[in-house]
Amino acid sequence: MPAKKPGAKRRPFRPRKFVRRAYDFLSTPLALFFLTYSRQVHDEYGMTWPKRMRLGYRFYRNFSKVQTGTNWRAHLVMAMKLLEIPPQVKGAVVECGCWRGGATVNLSLICEITGRELKVYDSFEGLPPPSPGDPIAARTFKNGFMPGMYGGALEEVTGNVRRYGAIDVCSFHKGWFKDTLPHHDGAIVLAFWDVDFYSSLHDCLLNLWPSIVDRGFVFLDEYRDVPYCSVFYSEKYWDKYFSCAPPGLIGIGTGVQVGMYFTDPSAGMGIPRIQGAESIAYCRKGDRSIWEYYPDEFENNPADPPMSAAT
């Protein structure tokens, strides 16, 4: 153990950070069991229980090796959903927004197992300049963020994937979404979008949704921001751009259950950090999330009680 340099400052003890890390470590065995439990995993993938445990452990290990904006448990949720897609259904996995490649590393591992390509779209230059009319972009830069922050160089990302993941299944597409996504080609069985802004989410939906296969998955990182996620319930938006009903979003506001302590959508944005959100949300193509029950529009509404019961 190397001796401390004279005069070196000792890092202050942070109890909330310690508790979060301790909880994550101690709950990992149970999380691995429950998150990998699925009777819908196809036998052709050969994912026995020991193999699922090893995959989950690699996700957990990689989470401490490569910086990422999403928890390894969320990555494991995506992996299990991918294993539920029949291997006969052709299509790639697409990641939009990869930062330094933490999620990319883990997604590449499950793509290697399932025999699918992982297509990674990112500017590799950090946050884009704000677009007119984008409230999240305006709020983000008003709070001190700058264009270019959260950027990981292409060489850094590919280096991380080569070291901890499966680089051979990956292709990388450098540029702003509005320039690269219109050129996407091929079916998509699962997409993961960590894109921050309204304008970026719109680019992903407009250019990639038509390529999502029926019953394919779209995962979203910004599930805590309810107005941001409301596009998945907007009848106007989906009718205007896709002529269909909105698909909805499972986990809006709080995320899907991954075993992390969580009480408040705003907790992930600031104090108290001990309650920070560590999850993900998703939708499936073909789902319909539209309200169709308006009892006052029907004469002799079946929801009305019989006259004998009302008197």
Language model: regions and residue ranges:
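Boundary detector for helix-to-coil junctions that initiate low-complexity/charged tails
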Residues: M1-V41
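Generic surface-pattern signal
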Residues: D24-A31, L35, R39, D43, ...
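S-adenosylmethionine/decaboxylated-SAM
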Residues: R52-Q67, K90-T311
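Class I SAM-dependent methyltransferase Rossmann-like catalytic core
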Residues: R39-V89
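An N-terminal domain-start capping segment
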Residues: R20-R21, F25, M80-Q88, A92-E95, ...
